[in-house]
Every structure is written in C-alpha cells, then in structure tokens.
Amino acid sequence: MADISLLYPKRKEVSAMTLTDESINDLSVDYIVESLTKDIYEKNSIKKILTNLTCDIDVINYRADVFEDILNFPELRDGLVELLKKLEDLRELEKFNKDGDASSLWQLINRLREIDGYVLCITMLKNILNTIPIKSQGLLDLKQTIEDIYNNGGFDILKKDIDETMAKAQNLKSVTIGVNLDSVLKPKNAGVISLNSFEITNSGILKNFMGFTGSKEELNSDEKVLSSHKLHPANPSLNRTKFGSIQQGANTNVHIDTSGSATGDDPLSQSLKKVVTDILKRMVKSIKATLQKYVNISGYSLVGLMPEIIFYIRFAELVDKMKEKKLPVCKPLAVHDDRVAYGEDIYNIKLAIKRTNGEEFDIIGNDITFDNEQRIYVMTGPNRGGKTTFTQAVGHCFLL
C-alpha cells in the first residue's frame, strides 16, 4: 500500500515547492481551509497539500481525474466517508502504540485490533470500488491493489483467523470480583469469582443486594476463587503512621491502615487491575500465536490515504454547494504547451464560499489569458473596485 497515492501517479518522482507565508496569506488559504472543515487534523492535512505545489502536468491531470470521479459519484464519496471513520480508528490506535508506557499486553491486543481494522478497510475498499464505474487512473490503481490483496490466497485465512481471535477476545464481558475484608471491614485482598460472557447491570447488582439483605442465610461460606491479590492502603502518606490515626485529606478525613508500604495508588483499583491483567495474559496466548503469522502486515499503511481522501471529499462537498448556488465550475486541463494559461469566467472562491454560507450578492466572472501575446497585466481602478479580488481569483485558479 505504501506506493499507492491518490495525489501522485505510480513511480512518479515529483518535486514540489512550498508556498511562503506571505503567499499563504495573500491567497487566504486559511480562510478556504476553515470553510471546508472544523476538524484540526483535517485542516492541517488539507493545508499541507494546498501549500505544496507541483508544476508537473501529469500529476495535475492525475489529480483532476481522481477529483472528477469523487465529485461525479456521490455513492463513492459516501463509501469513502465511512472508510474514513475506520481509518481514524487506526490512526488513533497508531498513536497509542507509540506510547512507550503501554504494557506489552495491551500492545498485543492493539496489534490484534490493528489487523482487524486492516481486514475491515480492505474489504470496505473492495466493496466500494467494485460497484462504481470509476475512470481515473488513481482510483483504478487503488482498485487493482485492493483486488490483488483480497484475492491473495492468504487473505481469506487472515480474515478467518482474525475474526475468530477477535470473537474470543470480545467474549469476555465482565469479571466477578470478591473482596476480602479485615476485622474492621476494610478491603484486604481481592479474588476472581467468575469470568462472564455478559455485562453486569445496575439492576442486577441491586437485585442481588436486596436478595442478600432479605435472606435468612446472610453469609456465603463458599471459599473458591480463581486468584487473589493483596490490597495496599488507600491514600497513604509518605510518613508511616500508627494504626488508627487520621490523615487530613483535601476534602475529608481518611482512616489510614499502614500495615504495608505506601504505594500512592488506590488499593482496590490496583488489585482489580492486577486480577484482570492476569486473566487477559492467559487469554491472549492464542492471540499471540495467531498474530505471529502476520508480522509483515501493517494496518497503518492504509492511514496514509486519509489526508488525500479528506482533501478530495471536502472540496467535492464545497463544489456541490457552489452548484446549488448556480455558480459555474469546470474541470481544468493542464497542457504541455509552454507557458500558456486560459481562464474563462473566473471568480474568487472566497466569494463563492460566502454565497454558500447564505450571503446574497452578484459574482462577476472575468476572462484571463497568459501567452506570448499577453504575459503581464496592470490593474488600475478605484479603491474597493475589485483589483485585489480579481488578482486573488487568478491565484486561486493556479492553486486549485
């Protein structure tokens, strides 16, 4: 997946030039980006693409063709929007895995989630691209890559393995914990009573409690537990205190038992964490064996498509709004002829954005030609006569 891009043709080495801060300001790039999305990640992705320009004719036409497909097929766009949600999950998972403090246990479980997300995204892309008559080389190349992966003899086995392993991992819904108390009814240690395939509800807890309070046999004598862990004192101080002393807390007085060394952690939470971790360690042995077969698969390779998909979709949404306002739009054609540019009825996209936001005013289009006969224009006219607006519109034609 690393060599697939919706911005650049395969095996195409292209140099790009980055707009200066002055040019970004003159072209109101931030205004345009802000109108497309409020999501910070999306804004940064779109701005990065907009401000890194290429003059390569093949790349420009390649992008125009991809955008045409995404614009012309709303069902393609809808499918890609759903795909973005799954890719966002993978992106968040990737950020978590870069956390050096994450335990090996959770890294293993997240590796399972990563491959599961990979399988899901490949399947979604296949279903999306196979049902739409796309024409652009970029999307056709992506379709072929997905087909090659999906039809590979190992993909069905991968999908089956991951589905079965995820089912095992997701089957554990709750753990019933028993907490031992000392002579003054303070938590002493905790043990696992049962592993459950159902979630415990508040109503169930209340029902059991009411049953206990109304029962003739008030205490259960069954001693069987699966495992137990010692509890450390709650809210310990750095100094050792005598049994029965009172520590002044931020909001209330807390009774401290200092029979063990201070840890600074909530005792019950820490004990439960250890119990659950021990259970999961046993459960993930089969997961680890499954994942070792797929060490070369990276679900994060698909995340690289996110900024490109976002870029096309958000501009397609803007063009749809412009069409609703009867504003003219067209597909540009980049030609190999030396230093020529022709624009007919061009207008400033900032005005179009204001129209789509509900402002009512007339937009006047203008023609522009750059060739050997007309290379330099001198703009004259009164203040607020449209000189800056028109000059910016010319810049937008090249930017977009």
Language-model regions, residue ranges each:
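Conserved amphipathic alpha-helical "coupling/scaffold" segments
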Residues: 1-192
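Conserved NTPase motor "head" modules and their coupling/switch loops across ABC/AAA+ ATPases, GTPases
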Residues: 2-9, 18, 308-385, 400
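Conserved P-loop NTPase architecture
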Residues: 99-130, 137, 141-149, 153-350
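Short, low-complexity, polar/charged sequence segments that are solvent-exposed and flexible
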Residues: 194-200, 360-363, 398
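Conserved glycine(s) of the Walker
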Residues: 385-387, 391
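GG-anchored amphipathic helix commonly corresponding to the ABC/SMC/Rad50 NBD signature/C-loop
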Residues: 391-400
